[in-house]
From Swiss-Prot:
GO biological process: tRNA wobble uridine modification
UniProt-annotated binding residues for S-adenosyl-L-methionine: Y40, G65, A66, S67, D90, N91, D122, I123, N137, R204
Family: Belongs to the class I-like SAM-binding methyltransferase superfamily. Cx-SAM synthase family.
Organism: Pseudomonas putida (strain ATCC 700007 / DSM 6899 / JCM 31910 / BCRC 17059 / LMG 24140 / F1)
Name used for this protein in its record: Carboxy-S-adenosyl-L-methionine synthase
Free-text function comment from the UniProt entry: Catalyzes the conversion of S-adenosyl-L-methionine (SAM) to carboxy-S-adenosyl-L-methionine (Cx-SAM).
Alphabetized CDD domains for the sequence: AdoMet_MTases
GO MF assignments: carboxyl- or carbamoyltransferase activity; S-adenosyl-L-methionine binding
Spans traversing the lipid bilayer: none
Highest taxon, organism lineage: Bacteria
Catalytic activity: prephenate + S-adenosyl-L-methionine = carboxy-S-adenosyl-L-methionine + 3-phenylpyruvate + H2O
UniProt KW keywords: S-adenosyl-L-methionine, Transferase
């Protein structure tokens, strides 16, 4: 996977456009997300480990918002249930093209990987097959808030008994002091990873109208409203967390 450094916002922009997952972002995405999301490599690797516990023979495993395929590859490496296949979905044509290239290259490096089908599609309109695992890694926060419950409800209906939804998201906090502290700590994380104040400010301007994070409590309440019986937080680093939701 490309290691091109993220310099997208390093020069002053007269007008900062809304963030989109286009070819420019795709080229630098691995570097961008590693330097922007604390704990990201840990989440990705362990998504495969978690999925192996819930995967059932002959079922689909979904990676919704697959981007360049890191989570998909983690699922393929760790899950050993017979007859499983991964369905990786993203609505960005640039992401899908590079995802396919990456996964094809992985096929030549690893043996006994699960088969994968990469789709360019809108997950809001996607008909789900019966599934034992659904992974949404920093995807729901880019869905319009008023469409999130309906999507989660459809995912819940597709999940088989004993399956799981693994949902990773950036969090906001109802407590103002906690929100301010964790926001500043996240900015410190970005600074420590080499982002300038200009880059941080312009990226924030680009993404604030596109990404709408929720509180942990909102996620838990919505998941229960969608029909999930249990919601278990399994990871948090600063204002980024991952949850296991059980049907």
């Amino acid at each position: 996977m490309s290691k091109q450094p993220d310099r997208l916002f390093s020069q002053p922009l007269e007008q900062v456009p809304d963030f989109v997952f286009n070819e420019d972002v795709v080229r630098v995405f691995p570097d961008m997300i590693k330097r922007s999301v604390p704990g990201y490599p840990t989440i990705v690797e362990n998504l495969g480990v978690l999925a192996a516990r819930f995967a059932q023979p002959g079922t689909a495993l979904y990676d919704l918002g697959a981007s360049l395929g890191a989570v998909t590859q983690s699922l393929r490496r760790h899950v050993r249930s017979d007859g499983c296949r991964v369905i990786a979905v993203d609505n960005s044509a640039a992401m899908v093209e590079r995802c396919r290239q990456y996964l094809t290259a992985q096929d030549s490096m690893f043996q006994e990987l699960l088969p994968v089908h990469v789709l360019e599609a809108d997950i809001l309109a996607l008909p789900f097959e019966p599934a034992s695992v659904v992974a949404m890694n920093f995807t729901l926060q880019f869905i319009a808030p008023d469409q999130r419950l309906e999507l989660l409800g459809r995912i819940r209906q597709a999940l088989l008994p004993g399956g799981a939804l693994i949902l990773s998201e950036k969090l906001r906090f109802a407590d103002e002091q906690a929100q301010d502290l964790l926001n500043e700590l996240h900015l410190d994380f970005k600074r420590a990873n080499g982002y300038s104040e200009l880059e941080i400010a312009q990226k924030r301007s680009a993404i604030e109208n596109v990404m709408k994070p929720d509180t942990l409590e909102t996620h838990q309440e919505r998941l229960r409203a969608a029909g999930f019986s249990k919601v278990v937080p399994w990871f948090q680093c600063l204002n980024f967390a991952s949850l296991i939701a059980l049907p």
